[in-house]
Amino acid sequence: MKAISPVRSMSSCYQAVCCLSEQSLSIARGSSHKGPGMDEPMGLLYDMNGCYSKLKELVPGIPQGSKLSQVEILQHVIDYIFDLQIVLGEDQQQSSILSLQKSDFSELATQGDTSVCH
């Protein structure tokens, strides 16, 4: 699975991350913002279902409108994170190669060897 992301505005991604962070904090604190009369386990279940729905929206490659199990959603998320790590690793490796080439060139230029220029 290739990490190809549809174009999203930065504000919508930021809002989604904030939403997930707020939900995670409310779960960790044990507060249920769904309603005062709601049982704790049911509140957590609704929060988790909301988180899975948000993951389906945010992770590219998950078919929208299809019924996936929670395990399948998590597998798509894991695959996407792995793809991102590979892409970031390749970018980092390319930038380090370019910086090495630049430093090698600057060493040659400071040695005063004019035969390189001819």
Swiss-Prot record:
Partners and quaternary state? Homodimer. Heterodimer with other HLH proteins. Interacts (via HLH domain) with the bHLH protein hes4/hairy2 (via Orange domain). Interacts with stat3.
Function of this protein? Transcriptional regulator (lacking a basic DNA binding domain) which negatively regulates the basic helix-loop-helix (bHLH) transcription factors by forming heterodimers and inhibiting their DNA binding and transcriptional activity. Influences cell fate decisions in the embryo by sequestering and blocking the activity of the bHLH transcription factors that control these decisions. Inhibits the binding of myogenic bHLH-containing complexes to E-box DNA, thereby preventing activation of muscle-specific target genes. Also inhibits the activity of neurogenic factor neurod1/neuroD.
Kindly give the Pfam families that the UniProt entry links to this protein: HLH (PF00010)
Q: Does Protein biosynthesis count among this protein's keywords?
A: no
Q: What does the tissue specificity note say?
A: At gastrula stage, expressed in all three germ layers, but becomes localized to discrete domains of the developing nervous system during neurulation, including the anterior neural plate, cement gland, eye anlagen, otic placode and both cranial and trunk premigratory and early migratory neural crest cells. Also expressed in the most dorsal and ventral portions of the myotome, the developing heart and anterior blood islets, and in the tail fin mesenchyme.
User: Can you say what this protein is called?
Assistant: DNA-binding protein inhibitor ID-3-A
SMART domains given for it?
HLH
Any GO CC annotation of this UniProt entry: nucleus
Q: Does the keyword Repressor apply?
A: yes
Q: Which InterPro entries does this chain map to?
A: bHLH_dom, DNA-bd_prot-inh, HLH_DNA-bd_sf
The alphabetized UniProt keywords are: Biological rhythms, Developmental protein, Nucleus, Repressor, Transcription, Transcription regulation
What positions does the domain bHLH occupy? 32-84
**Which one of the record's GO molecular function terms can you name?**
transcription corepressor activity
The entry's localization annotation reads: Nucleus
Task: Choose any GO biological process term that the UniProt entry carries and state it.
Answer: neural crest formation
- Which PANTHER family does this one have? DNA-BINDING PROTEIN INHIBITOR (PTHR11723), DNA-BINDING PROTEIN INHIBITOR ID-3 (PTHR11723:SF16)
**Induction (UniProt):** By bmp and notch signaling, and in response to signaling events of early neural crest induction. Repressed by hes4/hairy2 in a DNA-binding dependent manner through repression of bmp4 transcription, but up-regulated by hes4/hairy2 acting via delta1 activation. By myc.
